[in-house]
Amino acid sequence: MTIITLPYTYLTTLIGTDKETILDRLPMIGSDIERIEDDHADVEFFPDRPDLFSTEGVARAMRGFLGIETGSVTYEVKPSGVSFTIDPALKEIRPFLGSAVIRGLSLSEEAIQSLMGLQEALHWAIGRGRKKMAIGLHDLDKITPPFRYCAAEKSRSFVPLDFTEPMTMEQMLDEHPKGRAYAHLVREHPRYPLIVDAEDRVCSFPPIINGDLTRVTTETKNILLDTTGTDQRAVEVTVKIVCAALVEAGGTVESVTIDGVESPDLSPSVRTVSVDEGNKLLGLSLTAPEMATLLEKMRFKATPDGTDRIRVEVPCYRADIMHDWDIFEDVAVAYGYENFDATLPETSTIGEQSQVSVIGGAVREILTGLGYHEVMPFTLTSETVTYDLMQRERSPTALHLLHPITEDQTIVRTDLLPLLLELLQMNRYRELPQRIFCTGDVVEGISTHQKAAAVSCHGAADFSEAYAAADALCRDLNLPYTTAESTDPAFIDGRRGDIIVDGTTVGVFGEISPRVILGFELDHPIAAVELDLRAVRAHRDQRDRS
């Protein structure tokens, strides 16, 4: 969840109504007001609506929801004459670049704070901690086009933002706060990404820090936006969201030529939805014009096409719209959840905690007692992480996403160990030892069940530590187990064992293979243990029956 600060003065100016009305209706568009202060409110939004991570984005949505300004915003993008070239050497470092010029701005301190907040929120929600995408905002009048996005020597120096003396790029990774926080994204590469202008002045060292030369202030009238990353869609979506926010702040967007290609494309996408399908899903009886009117409140352009079809133009900044049902969800928001009729279920049942959840809770207590810290990795992952980096064959039973947003999230997780190793990779520059675990659902084919997994990473991690964790789990779960040597390319030969209960394998333990460790860019031995909680429950059920 993302919390943003909404200053009342700026927000009411953008929306055109009073604070009380805004605070009363704001939760209706999918927000949770965390805190109300004298001059601002802190509001939480779900990460699937990154277009609402700024005061400008909230104002745009609220104007529609309140009926002040409905329908979609038309973005007229003219050529700026500004161009970028990309160094081919960046292909293996940080290959993708998006850009735009925004002119005619008159920024207040509140507007600047809103843009900085949007920048950081997008770094988290879309950029995955700046790995997939990072944003730079520059005062265009302080630099000279054309610009180059190049791979520079680590010894290149410039004055970073909020500093007064030049530093080398290598120094920044050790001495600048942002450098220390994000050094792991670039340190392994022989050269670092850099954006320079026609006079070879540094604009930015993405994804670390901008140069102080291009600092955006209340005097800034024209902005150069750059978005770099390792994921092209994340880069493109981010450019659209930031451009749309800056239009709300009073700017006009102009395109930038990147190696001959114009950026950005702010045209809407078009979908045709069924009124009948929407009514069945929501339990309503809306006509096509009525549903179109509701969609206009949500800032779509909606045109009835007969009695059962609506042509919907989806704004460029709505990256969350991937299915017709996403549009119907906005119909429900505009209709008002408070206006739906409440009905009681025909049957009444009394719930209780499932046995698998009980076992999962016991596993968490045991591993916490052993010094492991619980983490919650994503449910979506990729075949690269799940199979390729684990040196395993790809499984035909993996559940694939039909329309994945990124190459990092193409399947539903089938295992937990790869995700724990990925988390170790993300934290590889942190202090050792690192001991983490997780419990949760995995999916194979159409079967969903729960597993638990734990890893320990440090210089002395070995098979004995993995066995000790497995023994503690089985002992405290009252599992009469035996072990048997087994093989798996993810583990070192001769250092992997199955946990067997009543002739059934319920888990594994062992020492991770050096090939896997190196694949995840780690440098230390790793001990691992994994339990199939479904199998543990089956044993308990059989024991209880006998």
Swiss-Prot record:
Its main location: cytoplasm. Its cofactor is Mg(2+). It comes from the Archaea. Its EC number is 6.1.1.20. InterPro entries: aa-tRNA-synth_II/BPL/LPL, B3/B4_tRNA-bd, DNA-bd_dom_put_sf, Phe-tRNA-ligase_IIc_bsu, Phe-tRNA-synth_IIc_bsu_arc_euk, Phe-tRNA_synthase-like_B3/B4, Phe_tRNA_ligase_beta2_arc, PheRS_beta_core. Coiled coil: none annotated. GO terms for molecular function: ATP binding; magnesium ion binding; phenylalanine-tRNA ligase activity; RNA binding. It catalyses: tRNA(Phe) + L-phenylalanine + ATP = L-phenylalanyl-tRNA(Phe) + AMP + diphosphate + H(+). The keyword Nucleotide-binding applies. One of its GO terms (biological process) is phenylalanyl-tRNA aminoacylation. Keywords: Aminoacyl-tRNA synthetase, ATP-binding, Cytoplasm, Ligase, Magnesium, Metal-binding, Nucleotide-binding, Protein biosynthesis. GO terms for cellular component: phenylalanine-tRNA ligase complex. Residues 266-342 form the B5 domain. Pfam families: B3_4 (PF03483), B5 (PF03484), tRNA_synthFbeta (PF17759). Mg(2+) binds at residues 320, 326, 329-330. The keyword Endoplasmic reticulum does not apply. It is found in: Cytoplasm. Belongs to the phenylalanyl-tRNA synthetase beta subunit family. Type 2 subfamily. Tetramer of two alpha and two beta subunits. HAMAP family: Phe_tRNA_synth_beta2 (MF_00284). NCBIfam families: pheT_arch. This is Phenylalanine--tRNA ligase beta subunit. The gene is pheT.
